[in-house]
């Protein structure tokens, strides 16, 4: 399993309207990873998106200190069974996905995440319904806000 940017942001920020379901999912995913019931991977593209959003004053009036943002990721990575996903050769999958689905603009980042998920065999957890068009249902957990 791997969390999308929106799940990381929501789980991290107690003031986020989706904090409770995101935190519940993330805590359970960490527990399952620690018990060997599931894997939990953090992708570089989602971690950088998380850092970009939580430190952006155009998104949050009260941005989070970068040390806290990095500390959140570090705390996840320190849990047994949680790993930082190594780069994969997702380009051919992303290219094909963008061409067949005519993906452009804001969905390009989502296409990269989807391609990485497909390539790695992971399951993505997100609030973002756009992924229903990018990923097969067995590789997608769509949380309800």
Model-derived regions, located:
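Short, well-structured N-terminal submotif of metal-dependent ribonuclease cores
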Residues: 1-42, 57-71
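Acidic active-site catalytic centers that drive phospho-/nucleotidyl reactions
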Residues: 4, 110, 128
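Generic structural signal for secondary-structure transition and capping sites
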Residues: 17, 31-34, 59, 78-82, ...
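Aromatic- and histidine-enriched alpha-helix N-cap/loop-to-helix transition segments
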Residues: 42-48, 108, 112
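Active-site-proximal, substrate-binding regions of enzyme catalytic domains
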Residues: 54-81, 88, 92, 97-99
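Active-site neighborhoods of divalent-metal-dependent phosphate/nucleic-acid chemistry enzymes
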Residues: 79-125
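Acidic, PIN/NYN-like endoribonuclease modules and their adjacent C-terminal/linker elements
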Residues: 114-145
């Amino acid at each position: 399993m791997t969390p999308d940017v929106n799940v990381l942001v929501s789980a991290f920020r107690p003031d986020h309207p989706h904090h409770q379901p995101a935190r519940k999912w993330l805590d359970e995913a960490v527990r399952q990873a620690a018990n060997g019931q599931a894997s939990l991977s953090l992708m570089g593209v989602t971690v950088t998106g998380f850092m970009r959003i939580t430190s952006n004053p155009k998104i949050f009036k009260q941005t989070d200190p970068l040390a806290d943002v990095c500390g959140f990721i570090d705390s996840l990575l320190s849990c047994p069974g949680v790993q930082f996903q190594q780069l994969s050769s997702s380009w051919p999958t992303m290219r094909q996905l963008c061409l067949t689905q005519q993906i452009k603009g804001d969905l390009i980042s989502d296409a990269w995440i989807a391609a990485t998920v497909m390539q790695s065999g992971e399951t993505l957890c997100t609030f973002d319904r756009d992924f229903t068009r990018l990923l097969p249902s067995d590789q997608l957990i769509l949380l309800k806000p």
